[in-house]
Amino acid sequence: MTKPIAKISLRKNARIGSNKNERRIPKGVIHVQASFNNTIVTVTDVRGRVVSWASAGTSGFRGTRKGTPYAAQAAAFNAIRTLVDQGMQRAEVMIKGPGLGRDAALRAIRRNGILLSFVRDVTPMPHNGCRPPKKRRV
């Protein structure tokens, strides 16, 4: 009977999260995606690997409260809280979407003591692309 060959990880890009607490990240990129229904804050390192993330839903808000500025502020605080302990000092901020949580999330990021290199609006704007949906009649 032949011996089974031990399988080494089949994933091309293995996860980095095994030594999360040991990694020091001095500079990162904070992505804020603010829709009308929710706000998602993702923190990556300079290479684009996700370090931490939070949303209004994971911060304990449900239903229509997820779209509020206060929920966006709580999501930004939860996403950045662990990174300040890991030593993040500088960050770039990319804001996407038309939601109410844009400014509130940015204010929460500024209050956490991280120096911002720049704040960039990366909301996708069509150059007269697809036809928009018809106007609602209420």
From Swiss-Prot:
A cellular component term, taken from the record's GO annotations: ribosome
Quaternary structure, per UniProt, is: Part of the 30S ribosomal subunit.
HAMAP family (alphabetical) = Ribosomal_uS11
**rRNA-binding found in the keyword field:** yes
Q: What is its main location?
A: plastid
UniProt name for this protein = Small ribosomal subunit protein uS11c
Q: Where is it localised?
A: Plastid, Chloroplast
The answer to whether keyword Aminoacyl-tRNA synthetase applies is no
Tell me which Gene Ontology terms the entry assigns under biological process. translation
Originating organism: Phalaenopsis aphrodite subsp. formosana (Moth orchid)
Record's family?
Belongs to the universal ribosomal protein uS11 family.
Q: Which domain of life is it from?
A: Eukaryota
Which keywords are on file for this protein?
A: Chloroplast, Plastid, Ribonucleoprotein, Ribosomal protein, RNA-binding, rRNA-binding
Task: Give the transmembrane ranges.
Answer: none
GO function term, MF aspect, one: structural constituent of ribosome
